[in-house]
UniProtKB/Swiss-Prot annotation:
CDD domains, per the entry: LamB_YcsF_like
Family: Belongs to the LamB/PxpA family.
Keyword vocabulary terms for this entry: ATP-binding, Hydrolase, Nucleotide-binding
Description of how the protein assembles with itself and partners: Forms a complex composed of PxpA, PxpB and PxpC.
Gene: pxpA
An MF annotation (GO) of this entry: ATP binding
Keyword Nucleotide-binding tagged: yes
GO BP annotations, alphabetical order: carbohydrate metabolic process
Biological role: Catalyzes the cleavage of 5-oxoproline to form L-glutamate coupled to the hydrolysis of ATP to ADP and inorganic phosphate.
Protein's name in the database: 5-oxoprolinase subunit A
EC code: 3.5.2.9
Enzymatic reactions: 5-oxo-L-proline + ATP + 2 H2O = L-glutamate + ADP + phosphate + H(+)
InterPro entries documented for this protein: Glyco_hydro/deAcase_b/a-brl, LamB/YcsF/PxpA-like
Domain of life (superkingdom): Bacteria
C-alpha cells in the first residue's frame, strides 16, 4: 500500500465549550468526520468547521450517532430499526444542508462511538444504518471498522465502503479495539503512534496489546480530535508516512 487517508472526528464543540483544535487539525487531515448534533456539535460550530474544511480542501463525512449528548454518543442504545433509520437520515440531511451553505458537500458517513462499535457486529442496527444512507444518497461511502461484518454487509447492499484503523487506540489479538475501560486502550505517545501506523501501512497490521501481531487491512487512519495530543499525533503520523514515501490523501 502506498496511499492512505488520514481522518479525524471534528465539529464536536458545543456553544462556548470547545472540543479540540479543529482549525489546526483541518490543516493536517485529508478527511473530516463532522458531528451532526446528536452526540456533540451545535449548528454554528458545525457550520464553522465545514467552512474551514472547505477552505483546506478536506473531504467531509457525516459523523452520525445515537441521540446521546450527555454520554457523548458512547452509550449503547436499544433502538428500533425505524427510529435508527430516521435518526441517521436526519443527521445526514442536516449536515448536507450546512455543507451546501458552506460551499462544500458530504461525501461519506462514519458512525460515531457506541453506534460505530455496535454496527460492526450487530446486523439489525447495521442494516438500519445502511438503509438510511441508501435512502439519502447511495453514492455516499460508508466508513467502518476494518475487518468488521458491517463492511461486507454494506457492500452486499450496494454501498462502497472504506476500512478504518485507529492511530490512538490499542488492538486485541483478534483485530478489534481494546475497550476504553481497560488500561492501555488509548495511546498518547505521538512517536509510538506514528511508528505503529507506518507498520500498519507497510506490513498490513500492528502490534496487539499482548505483544502479538494482528493483521488489519485499512484504507483510512483515524486520529480522535478530542484527544489532548491529537494535533501532534496527526502531524507526526502524516510526516512519518510521507517520509516513507506513502501518499496521504482522501479515499474520495
Amino acid at each position: 500500500m502506498n496511499m492512505i487517508d488520514l481522518n479525524s472526528d471534528l465539529g464536536e464543540g458545543f456553544g462556548q465549550w470547545k472540543m479540540g483544535d479543529d482549525n489546526t487539525m483541518l490543516s493536517i487531515v485529508t478527511s473530516a468526520n463532522v458531528a451532526c448534533g446528536f452526540h456533540a456539535g451545535d449548528p454554528a460550530g458545525i457550520f464553522q468547521t465545514l467552512k474551514s474544511a472547505h477552505k483546506n480542501q478536506v473531504v467531509i463525512g457525516a459523523h452520525v450517532s445515537y441521540p446521546d449528548l450527555v454520554g457523548f454518543g458512547r452509550r449503547n442504545m436499544d433502538v428500533s430499526s425505524n427510529e435508527l433509520i430516521a435518526d441517521v437520515i436526519y443527521q445526514i440531511g442536516a449536515l448536507k444542508g450546512l455543507a451546501v451553505a458552506a460551499g462544500t458537500t458530504v461525501s461519506y458517513v462514519k458512525p460515531h462511538g457506541a453506534l460505530y462499535n455496535t454496527i460492526a457486529h450487530n446486523e439489525y442496527q447495521a442494516l438500519a444504518v445502511i438503509t438510511a444512507i441508501r435512502e439519502v444518497d447511495d453514492n455516499l461511502v460508508l466508513v467502518g471498522l476494518a475487518g468488521s461484518k458491517l463492511l461486507d454487509l454494506a457492500q452486499e447492499n450496494g454501498l462502497r465502503t472504506v476500512a478504518e484503523a485507529f492511530a490512538d487506540r490499542a488492538y486485541t489479538p483478534q483485530g478489534t479495539l481494546v475497550s476504553r475501560r481497560e488500561k492501555g486502550s488509548v495511546l498518547h505517545d505521538a512517536n509510538l503512534v506514528a511508528r505503529r501506523m507506518l507498520q500498519l501501512v507497510t506490513e498490513g497490521g500492528v502490534e496487539a496489546i499482548d505483544g502479538s501481531f494482528t493483521r488489519i487491512q485499512a484504507d483510512s487512519i483515524c486520529v480522535h480530535g478530542d484527544s489532548p495530543d491529537a494535533v501532534e499525533m496527526a502531524r507526526q503520523v502524516k510526516l512519518t508516512l510521507q517520509q516513507a514515501g506513502i501518499t496521504v490523501r482522501s479515499f474520495i
